[in-house]
Regions:
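Positively charged n-region of N-terminal signal peptides that target proteins for export
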Residues: 1-4, 18
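Bacterial N-terminal signal peptides
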Residues: 7-16
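Low-complexity, acidic/polar, glycine-enriched regions of mature
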Residues: 20-187
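Short, basic/polar N-terminal leader/transit segment immediately after the initiator methionine
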Residues: 3-6, 24-25
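Conserved short hydrophobic patches within well-ordered secondary structure
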Residues: 6-7, 184
Length: 187
């Protein structure tokens, strides 16, 4: 009986040790395993797509209680890249992104609302063009696991819509649609 109890404890020990809890992650911008893309109507007719090349951030993901997770992302708005240098310079002007006066954007979550096993709404505050407003990211869990370099990663994707007038932008091309692809390395 004693041997059976010891065997049962040894078998159960690894399971207990692997129980997931909150973990901190750094967004992998070095390996380009993350992206912030956008699309907006080009003169109200077709889609103009692009991305922000410079951003950084971190998140805490609690696998057992995703509602306790947290996200912080900082974006260098002047790193806007629409694959056309002259247009990118124009987009940075005061009439558009106003990057000289407000070169960065900041998002910080305030809560996470779990909507299904692998989706949720990340509620937070977005500071853009010097204006801070409540802002939601509609997120989906993509996956997690060991990487080939001895680390551990978690990945998510999210969408959001920016209403330019909410952030004192004057351009009239409609809403800006964001797609975020985030892979983090556990710290």
């Amino acid at each position: 009986m004693k041997k059976l109890l010891i065997a049962a404890m040894l078998f159960a020990a690894p399971i207990g040790l692997s129980t997931a809890s909150a973990a901190d992650y750094k967004i992998d911008v070095e390996g380009m395993h993350a992206a912030i893309n956008f699309k907006v109507k080009h003169v109200g007719i077709s889609w103009l797509t692009g991305r922000f090349d410079k951003f950084d951030g971190s998140f805490t993901f609690d696998e057992n209680d995703p509602s306790a997770s947290k996200v912080i992302v900082d974006v260098d708005v002047s790193s806007v890249n629409s694959n056309h240098q002259k247009r990118d310079e124009h987009i940075q002007d005061p009439g558009y992104l106003n990057t000289e006066a407000n070169p960065s954007a900041h998002f910080e979550s305030t809560s996470v609302e779990v909507t299904s096993d692998d989706t949720g709404i990340i509620h937070g505050n977005l500071t853009l063009n010097g204006v801070t407003k409540p802002f939601d990211l509609h997120a989906s869990f993509v996956g997690m696991g060991d990487d080939p370099w001895g680390g551990y990663r978690s990945a998510f994707e999210a969408t959001a819509v920016i209403h330019p007038e909410d952030f004192d932008y004057k351009f009239k091309y409609g809403d800006v649609y964001l797609e975020l692809y985030i892979e983090g390395v556990r710290q």
